[in-house]
């Protein structure tokens, strides 16, 4: 049976990738349908109740800068906010917030239900409609057909999902939800490379059964950092602490004694787990020299007693989980509310994706989130936003867009995935970006909001706020450049108390701000440079831009050099066997990857600078180089 309405974009799955994808497509004016197996789980935090962290917070800020939802949702649901790496340079500072799961989910659903151009419908999808390598729509569990020009699959861990607790296992998409078996079988019929990954989650604990008096409390920052560029502290709910406990030798003995009952160590789980979020049994075996591991006790919300013990993700049997939990200080009488488990699921090799998240083999079909081999809410949200945007552009017969590596962590993410692929769940870190001094949390809007406005993602309120900030920054920098002091100026005594060496020659406000010991806050206490900007974000940008000017300029020069051939197109039909001088290995890799540009080709493992030079000569010889792209 065909549904009575056609759509431009269909999004399958209502997690962190799906919600951002649906909102992006709808914001750009396309009739969008979001299909989910259960409307009550839209925006659900399936694992840890937190958003952000090193690399991840950067992605959240970028999603926000492009009009996305995640940062605003956590600003309305965050019950503890912290700035990580606060004592380090601005490039690696990152925001992280604990979330009230219920508040987060409610905020997401409210936005979805009130977004123009967006229709929600509760039905699992069992099939995709493909004709002549083009997507035409989807078929739901009850045989209902929906037609659209573009389809975005954001199916999380549901494809062929299998839940493991000890040596027992059963089909499931996550605890309490059915897997997507029919769709998994259907997708395996399509010409994609598919494999298995696994992830896990710890048992949840009843706070009423924990002795907090013996635990170390960990409080958030005061004043609390704000995630969204449109956010305010007044949006934050009541703030509460987290707690810290540790595993001990007794814990480790319990784990070692029961390894034969672990599905991972018994060889039942084939999928590879996340390297940077290992299970407790993995930690004990991999770091055998450690007699203790720190465990963060994270509240799941203001109106629940459930606790999330971050650091003891496990798939060991339930009786062993009880022993592990009760071996830790403060948890001697702990009651487990939900058992921990591992989940194994299908993912598709992201090297089969274009940089727009469109699949190379089925036109109009886009993948985002864990289906691409990533882990984490933030990575999912970033992919969802870009896939939704590009599905919208595709449905309008417009050229797709994705940021470069030097423009955004979102650019690093898709470039890493589509050129190198992944064998384990991929997590974002600041260390993955070559140009991280330019890719800071604080300047995500300066990097992306203007482009997002051009693409139709940014509303008038955000655009007005952005332009006000730009204006404030420009005026303040001009003021500091034009305001001078010399050793004889009024107020120089006060200035000298702030400097390591007394002032010996005339200097502008910007000259003084470049000094390591000087901050914008200190500088504007001096009468000559008062008053400070009321716009705290603009003030922060002024300080960073002035202090790091030389380093920033150096990175921009490097980028300009590397960009010379970044976007030089490689014809899709090019047979690399016909390119004289390429080794057999290079030919095989290029024919398998079919890179869209010289830049992408250069980042494929095993493709040498010499091979790139040969390609450029070939393109020039056949008149395929544009003016200014000389080989």
From Swiss-Prot:
One matching Pfam family: GIDA
Residues the record lists as binding NAD(+): 273-287
Required cofactor names: FAD
Gene Ontology cellular component annotations, sorted alphabetically: cytosol
One of the record's GO molecular function terms: flavin adenine dinucleotide binding
SMART domains assigned: GIDA_assoc_3 (SM01228)
UniProt xrefs under PANTHER family: GLUCOSE INHIBITED DIVISION PROTEIN A, PROTEIN MTO1 HOMOLOG, MITOCHONDRIAL
Purpose of the protein: NAD-binding protein involved in the addition of a carboxymethylaminomethyl (cmnm) group at the wobble position (U34) of certain tRNAs, forming tRNA-cmnm(5)s(2)U34.
HAMAP family linked to this entry: MnmG_GidA
Family membership noted in the UniProt record: Belongs to the MnmG family.
Protein name (database record): tRNA uridine 5-carboxymethylaminomethyl modification enzyme MnmG
